[in-house]
Regions:
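Dinucleotide-binding Rossmann-like beta1-alpha1 core, especially the glycine-rich loop
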Residues: 1-79, 211-212, 366
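Active-site substrate-recognition segment that forms the wall
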Residues: 4-11, 16-23, 133, 138, ...
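C-terminal lid/capping helical subdomain adjacent to the catalytic/cofactor pocket in oxidative enzymes
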Residues: 53, 292-367
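Short loop/edge segments at beta-strand edges and connector loops
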Residues: 55, 125-127, 272
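Charged, glycine/proline-rich intrinsically disordered loops and linkers
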Residues: 61-92, 330-340
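FAD-binding beta-loop-beta segment adjacent to the flavin cofactor pocket
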Residues: 66-68, 72-86, 267-312
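Helical element adjacent to the flavin cofactor pocket in flavoenzyme catalytic cores
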Residues: 80-154, 158, 165
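Mid-domain beta-loop-alpha active-site segment that forms a flexible
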Residues: 94-114, 160-162, 209, 246-257, ...
Length: 367
């Protein structure tokens, strides 16, 4: 598991220290919205992923501060019956003991930067790409706004919420059935109730009954995000470099929805957290693919759910690029990739830019 053995994966020690994986476990409530995790359980059995079924008593034992009344469907705070139980109670959840979170995502990105630099990579910051240089349907490099040009026979679009713009610049969108688009997201950072040591005793919880997920944060704080229920309007952004980075009423809605589960939560008037962008596809599944322009590849559309997969996604992209540069036609005969920790081979074509929208998707950050 790459995050557990982060130093081994990097093969380099960052002067800022290394990000840490906290194996707290993760509880996913079994709800109407996720079909009581029937498909998830089958997949876990197939892949031998450890899990435990917790009944209501077990959940209350582990989360004594939780109110297990049902509030489904999730609502906005101004909607009728917001905060009122529908008369039922959550009965069970699935706990994944080997799950967890990475303590500092920004530090983990810096760790990868330093490891890449150690092997010869160079980084340019605050630079704007204005042209994807190409000749005879082959990429030849990139041109920046200041006029600098960098030649290369391979270019990978891993531009996050700017990926749509870069693909347009490269003129590779005509054959794409799946596209990307920046989506504004708000994540709440709030104090845990004083009676709860959530930092040390808490764990990741996914709760589609109230439409939020949460995890512990240092300083006995809680991070709360939306699971994108239908009531939460999507805030699409046209320009990833120019959008409103202020919190909206969504911040308070997320806090109040979580407070349905944790009545002791103090509702602060001071907004804290993160406002940023997802790079979202139509089915919230990423694009890991080649393109109609030879040598130009895509690792985009991460849709808020691919950070955890970054180490293996990088290895998969390397395999895909080698496969295509050896004159294999990935569109017709997709590359296969072995997942070493579970000894399973996957079809990389699953992530194709030319795929049909996956109807089995959650169409949310859950992927």
């Amino acid at each position: 598991f790459y995050w557990k053995n982060w130093n081994d994966y990097l093969q380099f020690v960052d002067e800022r220290g290394l990000a840490t994986f906290k194996e707290t476990g993760c509880l996913i409530m079994q709800t109407q919205a996720n079909n009581y995790l029937e498909k998830h359980i089958k997949i876990c059995d197939e892949l031998q992923i450890p899990y435990q079924q917790w009944n209501r008593e077990k959940i209350k034992n582990k989360l004594p501060h939780y109110n297990l009344e049902q509030f489904y469907p999730p609502k906005l705070q101004e909607e009728k019956n917001f905060g009122l139980s529908n008369g039922n109670h959550l009965k069970s959840g699935i706990f994944f003991p080997t799950a967890g979170y990475v303590t500092d995502p920004a530090l983990s990105a810096h760790n990868i930067q330093r490891a890449a630099e150690n092997t010869g990579a160079a980084f340019l910051f605050n630079s704007t790409v204005t042209e994807i240089i190409q000749n005879n349907n082959r990429v030849e490099g990139v041109c920046l706004a200041n006029g600098d040009k960098y030649t290369s026979s391979i270019v990978v679009n891993v531009a996050g919420p700017w990926s749509r713009k870069i693909n347009q610049i490269a003129n590779v969108t005509k054959d794409m059935m799946i596209t990307t688009r920046p989506l504004k997201q708000e994540v709440v950072h709030i104090n845990a109730p004083k009676s709860i040591d959530f930092e040390n005793n808490g764990f990741v919880v996914s709760d589609s009954d109230v439409g939020v997920y949460c995890r512990p944060e240092k300083g006995n704080n809680i991070l709360i995000g939306s699971e994108d229920p239908p009531c939460d309007a999507h805030q699409w952004v046209e320009d990833a470099s120019d959008y409103d980075q202020n919190f909206t009423e969504q911040w308070r809605t997320l806090v109040l929805r979580y407070a349905q589960r944790v009545p002791e939560l103090e509702i602060s008037t001071k907004t804290r957290g993160v406002v940023d962008l997802y790079d979202t596809t139509e089915d919230w599944i990423p694009i890991y693919d080649c393109s109609s322009l030879k040598g130009y590849y895509m690792a985009c559309g991460s849709s808020g759910n691919q950070y955890k997969n970054a180490p293996i996604a990088g290895k998969m992209m390397a395999k895909l690029i080698e496969y295509c540069e050896d004159n294999n036609n990935h569109d017709r005969n997709p590359c296969k990739f072995l997942l070493p920790y579970i000894n399973k081979t996957i079809n990389v074509g699953f992530y194709s830019r030319r795929r049909k929208i996956n109807k089995d998707s959650s169409f949310s950050v859950l992927g």
